[in-house]
Amino acid sequence: MAYVTMRELLEAGVHFGHQTRRWNPKMKKYIFGARNGIYIVDLQQTVKMFRDAYDFITDVTAQGKSVLFVGTKKQARDSVYEEANRAETYYVQNRWLGGMLTNFQTIKKTISRFEFLSTIENDGTIEDYPKKERVKMAKERVKLEACIGGISKMKNLPGAIFVIDPKNESIAVKEGKRLGIPIVAVVDTNCDPDDIDYVIPGNDDAIRSIRLFASKIADAAIEGHQRYLEKQNAGSDKDMDEAAFGGSAPVAAAVERTIESDGSDGPVVEMIRRKTIPAE
């Protein structure tokens, strides 16, 4: 369990919000005060609210569901890419395509096209096409990778969405809300927190702040997935045990005694046989 500490938040500059003239009044309850024209985030609330977000992400992945990382602005791209890959989950780091979630069946067709182009490039069969066609397909593959490369293995909708800057990722937030997918987001002083299920008040512009939160959420996803695997393995072991006993474990052993010789022509001989009685 890797909850964030006050010291980590301070060192990453999480407490620095936007200028006082650029704020959303709905964030007032998460603001400690202002200094030199900059709002200061109440980090005591951040610590508590991040703990709730962390536990939620852990619970989601412990159920075998995925988390979609979203951060398309320049400061967030590297952290989103690296931490999502570390957690072996999905991400959008360049541009959110409208309908990426709400029109997922169509997006699946685009993913299939991307997989086809990647396959023929990797196995060399692209060389069977005319040069003009090869150039065209190579450009198409690069373009698709930039848009959907991070979700190319996603077969179902995610169990949660982790967003850096919900104001910048407003389309992703709207699609998630429309589909009832819970949203966890780093919310700065200029954002509207109303559409966010798990608000993490803090700086969503500083690279260090973004990386801190992305890495911690990745830790939560990894922890939850590990729990999921442990439950799966425990279930498999139980099934194997039951199969070994024909679906039920033995609960008693009956003793059957048989007199082989009554002693008239020598010592008394008694045979003892144990019979297993399976559970009903």
UniProtKB/Swiss-Prot annotation:
Keyword Transport: no
Signal peptide region: none
Keywords: Ribonucleoprotein, Ribosomal protein
Cited Pfam families: Ribosomal_S2 (PF00318)
Family label: Belongs to the universal ribosomal protein uS2 family.
Gene: rpsB
Gene3D superfamilies: Glucose-6-phosphate isomerase like protein, domain 1 (3.40.50.10490), Helix hairpin bin (1.10.287.610)
UniProt name for this protein: Small ribosomal subunit protein uS2
GO cellular component, as recorded: cytosolic small ribosomal subunit
The keyword Electron transport appears for this protein: no
InterPro entries in alphabetical order: Ribosomal_uS2 (IPR001865), Ribosomal_uS2_bac/mit/plastid (IPR005706), Ribosomal_uS2_CS (IPR018130), Ribosomal_uS2_flav_dom_sf (IPR023591)
Example of a GO biological process term: translation
Gene Ontology MF terms: structural constituent of ribosome
